[in-house]
């Protein structure tokens, strides 16, 4: 089974915020594939389907961003999954706005959701699809307000285009594209 974890925060106040781009990407993929989410006992909302003969599970952790690893670990344990079959969709302030980047391994880069996943899985070698938010000034209160802020109307066309590209990128991964192939096709 392929597991696609979109990272974000649960609650209407976080809907359409920059930090929730992972949720937005997994929602876009679900919509494109006529999938709907339901609650699970593994601290998440899940949607399941089969694409090209491959079982696929979309996951939105309900633990809040900074404890996403709890849901990842619970899902992998319950479904006897492995980090090799995981794709994490996550925001990245160090990427220019509107760019996407696949990364097969590495540190959390200061992202608490990724840090939680690494802590709970004991691994840094899971595939991530990072969505560029751009970076405001490096003052902590400005950064927090930026990531928890909603996308502007001017940003919406770029976000929609990025979500469309991510839907195709996720489909390519499900169909067996390797990390280097995905990087060559989608990293911008």
From Swiss-Prot:
Function: Hydrolyzes ribosome-free peptidyl-tRNAs (with 1 or more amino acids incorporated), which drop off the ribosome during protein synthesis, or as a result of ribosome stalling. Catalyzes the release of premature peptidyl moieties from peptidyl-tRNA molecules trapped in stalled 50S ribosomal subunits, and thus maintains levels of free tRNAs and 50S ribosomes.
One GO-annotated biological process of the protein: protein quality control for misfolded or incompletely synthesized proteins
Subcellular location: Cytoplasm
Cited NCBIfam families: pth
KW tRNA processing (keyword) present: no
Site label Discriminates between blocked and unblocked aminoacyl-tRNA, positions: 9
UniProt cross-references to HAMAP family, sorted A to Z: Pept_tRNA_hydro_bact
Catalytic activity: an N-acyl-L-alpha-aminoacyl-tRNA + H2O = an N-acyl-L-amino acid + a tRNA + H(+)
Family note: Belongs to the PTH family.
Keyword Nucleus assigned: no
Annotated protein name in UniProt: Peptidyl-tRNA hydrolase
